């Protein structure tokens, strides 16, 4: 029985030693895992910050582009409105067509008001002659 007890004692010592080594190995592995996780986390954070910065910069560029497009669109609409108003004024006899809608092309818009029939007493406007009108027949 002594041999048996001695064998169990040695086995116990081996298990204790193995457990110590395992505990030490697990602690070391846990420490390295923690370092690895922290490293990956910091790199991910840097990547996220860089990614967010990049997205923010691209968004800013797109907003600028959209803003420029809106301004361009509004300018085009305003120009077409002026041209349309000029055509209407010319068709109704309130101005000369060659003076209307040429402000952006560099032609002066001076003289437009002088060509308009204006009543100084603000009582009534003189109707243009019917020579400039065409008969309108609605489509059926």
Curated annotation (Swiss-Prot):
Record localization: Cytoplasm; Membrane; Nucleus; Synapse
Xref: SUPFAM superfamilies: Synuclein
Q: Which residues carry this modification: Phosphoserine?
A: 87, 129
Region Interaction with SERF1A: start-end pairs:
111-140
Phosphotyrosine sites (modified residues): 125
Q: For the region Disordered, what residue ranges are annotated?
A: 93-140
Q: Which Gene Ontology molecular function entries are recorded, alphabetically? A: copper ion binding; cuprous ion binding; identical protein binding
Record: residues binding Cu cation: 2, 50
- Please state the span of the N-terminal signal peptide per the UniProt entry: none
A cellular component term, taken from the record's GO annotations: membrane
Q: Which InterPro entries does this chain map to?
A: Synuclein, Synuclein_alpha
Acidic residues composition bias: which ranges? 112-140
Q: How is it modified after translation?
A: Phosphorylated, predominantly on serine residues. Phosphorylated on Tyr-125 upon osmotic stress.
Q: Where is the composition biased (Basic and acidic residues)?
A: 95-105
Task: Detail the disulphide connectivity of this chain as listed in its UniProt entry.
Answer: none
- One Pfam match, given by its short name, reads Synuclein
Kindly state which keywords UniProt assigns to this record, in alphabetical order. Acetylation, Cell projection, Copper, Cytoplasm, Membrane, Metal-binding, Nucleus, Phosphoprotein, Repeat, Secreted, Synapse, Ubl conjugation
GO BP terms:
chemical synaptic transmission; regulation of dopamine secretion; synapse organization; synaptic vesicle endocytosis
Question: Which Gene3D superfamilies does the protein's record reference?
Answer: Helix hairpin bin (1.10.287.700)
- Protein family per UniProt: Belongs to the synuclein family.
Q: What does this protein do?
A: Neuronal protein that plays several roles in synaptic activity such as regulation of synaptic vesicle trafficking and subsequent neurotransmitter release. Participates as a monomer in synaptic vesicle exocytosis by enhancing vesicle priming, fusion and dilation of exocytotic fusion pores. Mechanistically, acts by increasing local Ca(2+) release from microdomains which is essential for the enhancement of ATP-induced exocytosis.
Q: Report the protein name in the record.
A: Alpha-synuclein
- Native source species: Bos taurus
């Amino acid at each position: 029985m002594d041999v048996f007890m001695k064998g169990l004692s040695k086995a116990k010592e081996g298990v204790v030693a193995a457990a110590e080594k395992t505990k030490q190995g697990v602690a070391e592995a846990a420490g390295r895992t923690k370092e690895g996780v922290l490293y990956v986390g910091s790199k991910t954070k840097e990547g996220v910050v860089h990614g967010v910065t990049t997205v923010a910069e691209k968004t800013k560029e797109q907003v600028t582009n959209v803003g420029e497009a809106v301004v361009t669109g509004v300018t085009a609409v305003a120009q077409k409105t002026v041209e349309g108003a000029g055509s209407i004024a010319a068709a109704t006899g309130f101005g000369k067509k060659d003076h209307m809608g040429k402000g952006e092309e560099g032609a002066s818009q001076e003289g437009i008001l002088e060509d308009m029939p204006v009543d100084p007493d603000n009582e009534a406007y003189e109707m243009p002659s019917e020579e400039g009108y065409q008969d309108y027949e609605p489509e059926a």
